Amino acid sequence: MDYKETLLMPQTEFPMRGNLPKREPEIQKKWEEMDIYRKVQERTKGRPLFVLHDGPPYANGDIHMGHALNKILKDIIVRYKSMSGYCAPYVPGWDTHGLPIETALTKKGVDRKSMSVAEFRKLCEQYAYEQINNQREQFKRLGVRGDWENPYITLKPEYEAQQIKVFGEMAKKGLIYKGLKPVYWSPSSESALAEAEIEYKDKRSPSIYVAFPVKDGKGVLDGDEKIVIWTTTPWTIPANLAIAVHPDLDYQVVETNGAKYVVAAALLESVAKEIGWDEVTVVKTIKGKDLEYVVAKHPFYDRDSLVICGEHVTTDAGTGCVHTAPGHGEDDFIVGQKYGLDVLCPVDERGYMTSEAPGFEGLFYDEANKAITQKLEEVGALLKLSFITHSYPHDWRTKKPTIFRATTQWFASIDKIRGELLQAIKETKWIPEWGEIRIHNMIRDRGDWCISRQRAWGVPIPVFYGENGEPIITDETIEHVSNLFRQYGSNVWFEREAKDLLPEGFTHPSSPNGIFTKEIDIMDVWFDSGSSHQAVLVERDDLQRPADLYLEGSDQYRGWFNSSLSTAVAVTGKAPYKAVLSHGFVLDGEGRKMSKSLGNVVVPAKVMEQLGADILRLWVASVDYQADVRISDSILKQVAEVYRKIRNTFRFMLGNLFDFNPETDAVPVNELREVDRYMIVKLNHLIENVKHAYETYDFASIYHDVNNFCTVDLSAFYLDFAKDILYIEAPNDRARRSIQTVLYETVVALTKLVAPILPHTAEEVWEHIPNRKEKEESVQLVDMPETINIDEEDAIVAKWDAFMNLRDDVLKALEVARNEKVIGKSLTASVTVYPTKEARQLLGSIEEDLKQLFIVSEFTIADDYEHAPEDAQKLANVAVIVKPAEGETCERCWVVTPEVGKDADHPTLCPRCAHIVKEHYSA
């Protein structure tokens, strides 16, 4: 007879090859048809909520690897929580207002001058929705489960309505005010410009080095030095109020031509060369931070210029001492706010100097350059004048140069709530811990928040003006505008006159004649997304504020984490989140930033096309995502190899359960053979470790633990020796059923454990588990596995861990014999061991299983370790002799034994196989 027919070889339709790029979309289609998101929500209804609030990506362009990392991390957490006792809704969002969309339309050839603001905004909205639909499909392809049909979108009427309420609440508390801030200003078109309305062209400008005499050295300088600044805008010198230095840079006091000057050490050589200093002596070196609060004198006005510290100071050019005019520069303004400097802006809207620049009033700023340079020369402050050609911002419409000029803007006060903000930070859990220090320092040091923008595409600032120009913000106007936006969307602001946006019959003391105008500025987009705690968490029934977790890239400490905190504390006095987790950036394999010019961009869509989403998700689980992470073809190849091993382990287990029904064939757990109970204990440890790692967001541990469990515990040990029993023994053999019981428990538990990370593969395994006890149609509809109680667990672990060490010794000896060509496969070997006393006791207790456990044909426990023959390999706990086994090879189980052929009916079989065949396969 053909003995092959009597072997119980693995049978499963679970394919060896993942073929994920083809199979994943089929699995996703099944999820969609099942409406899996709804099913999960229904199943977990009534459980405690766990809300991970999605930070909205900007609706523009295809998703990049940073998006993929972010969304996959969120999805892993949400999937785990919904399998471990929580109801975990996930509502994805999109950020849709702002400059990039305006710019994208302009690039597409939209001529905004030929249409009304309302018409242009309709095109912006249309474009945003196109981008959302594109990104939504890409996010879904990653396997991210969420309420994709009901996302939150910052341009939706209900969102804008809530945002207006946030603004109104802040205004009511006195946190919204008007103040000055420098913006791009075009004297030629007499208006503020957005960055999108700027184009860079070459311009010839004066380049001057100016000396500011020290007035009070604060014990750091002697008082007879001069601080040297460099600028290409002499017209801003009348507005100078400070000199900025970098706190961490070295500065030097140098003596030349009988005078002492202060410059950055790193720039001394270039400054000396430029000004023409011959012999220079370094008098002393000082850190920038030690120069803070030194007082210098303005070169030609009777006022002070304070030395301040600023992180924006560089050593790229100039002197390292930066002329600071808060009315004429973004950095100057921000650092000036920190030090409480005035915002002096002696230039009018047409670009002419005002009376705040005595001596230069009435001069066009460009002409003032010459007059001011002459004045500096007269007072002996000009060290060098030359001319340079450099790239300079111009008005894209008039093609004329722009200037930075302080204009009136709307602000949200951070100062008034700084204490509450810092307290809220303390009450929040920050992961990693350095996140707390980072955001604490940002909030501690930040100035007030400029929330107005002179653009078209955004949420209008809901302010009206009376006849005397006084701003009007009342509970009544806010409520009315919020309701209008909820009904019509914010475009209504641009379609109606002020009177038609106010409540009927509205009156105000500032407008005796009932004439009102409206604000035309819009809100900063960070105010949009920063209001999501109210516009999403409070607005929607399935969510709650505060969220349990915000999870974004580390750039969001200054972005969304910050703006959300500011608006939430302003409105509720509390943070909008209980915990904040941040991840790093995605770099290439060499640790370089990805860029088109370097050609090192790895695109998620490409990876999914070639390898599949589960490989990308496994990569996310493999990296230390709290720092910057690396990705490349070779890194993905390594991950794909780990995936292959995990998949093959699943396949082996599934294949060997084809004739197993847990209801009828399972062996009670405490009746399992000891080695099988040991594997259950190993499985218990895996379950505990993996669940703990999910709880602490430590996915890399899961990656390593699952990989080790599959390759070391299962493939290299348990499954390896189990084959002999699974394939060879009779179907109902107790040892075989014992192993199958372990395989069943393992495959079910392992599928659940990896489901949050590898949802497609887990789903596929789930479908292929024969006679599954849990009838749920998806692995997403069950909970994480529980550990299985085993009697005398500690004793089993101690004994079998010791055996595994012994096994390593014997395997080493087998490897040596194989390399020396003494044996071929291990089944051709006969092993004799000379154990130590402890080892003898251990081996003696499992003597009858040793041949199977070591996959050899003969295993003998001989004399004590001390009496081992000379030629034995001496290892830690045993001395080992390996020789070829004597006898014939059994045709059915391949064991080598002299007893082959003892049964005349089956001359090529060993007695064990002959017995099995006679009992179970004879006609």
UniProtKB/Swiss-Prot annotation:
Cofactor names: Zn(2+)
One Gene Ontology term from the biological process aspect of the record: isoleucyl-tRNA aminoacylation
Sites where the protein binds Zn(2+): C890, C893, C910, C913
Residue numbers covered by motif 'KMSKS' region: 593-597
Primary localization: cytoplasm
GO CC, any one term: cytosol
Motif 'HIGH' region, chain ranges: 57-67
Co-factor binding comment: Binds 1 zinc ion per subunit.
InterPro entries for this protein: aa-tRNA-synth_I_CS, aa-tRNA-synth_Ia, Anticodon_Ile_BEm, Ile-tRNA-ligase, Ile-tRNA-ligase_type1, Ile-tRNA_ligase, M/V/L/I-tRNA-synth_anticd-bd, Rossmann-like_a/b/a_fold
Disulfide bridge positions per record: none
Reactions catalysed, as given in the entry: tRNA(Ile) + L-isoleucine + ATP = L-isoleucyl-tRNA(Ile) + AMP + diphosphate
Gene3D superfamilies per UniProt: 1.10.730.20, HUPs (3.40.50.620), Ile-tRNA synthetase CP2 domain-like (1.10.10.830), Valyl/Leucyl/Isoleucyl-tRNA synthetase, editing domain (3.90.740.10)
PANTHER family: ISOLEUCINE--TRNA LIGASE, MITOCHONDRIAL (PTHR42765:SF1), SOLEUCYL-TRNA SYNTHETASE (PTHR42765)
Domain topic, free-text comment: IleRS has two distinct active sites: one for aminoacylation and one for editing. The misactivated valine is translocated from the active site to the editing site, which sterically excludes the correctly activated isoleucine. The single editing site contains two valyl binding pockets, one specific for each substrate (Val-AMP or Val-tRNA(Ile)).
Similarity annotation: Belongs to the class-I aminoacyl-tRNA synthetase family. IleS type 1 subfamily.
Subunit annotation: Monomer.
Stored HAMAP family: Ile_tRNA_synth_type1 (MF_02002)
Role: Catalyzes the attachment of isoleucine to tRNA(Ile). As IleRS can inadvertently accommodate and process structurally similar amino acids such as valine, to avoid such errors it has two additional distinct tRNA(Ile)-dependent editing activities. One activity is designated as 'pretransfer' editing and involves the hydrolysis of activated Val-AMP. The other activity is designated 'posttransfer' editing and involves deacylation of mischarged Val-tRNA(Ile).
The name this protein goes by in its record: Isoleucine--tRNA ligase
Gene expressing this chain: ileS
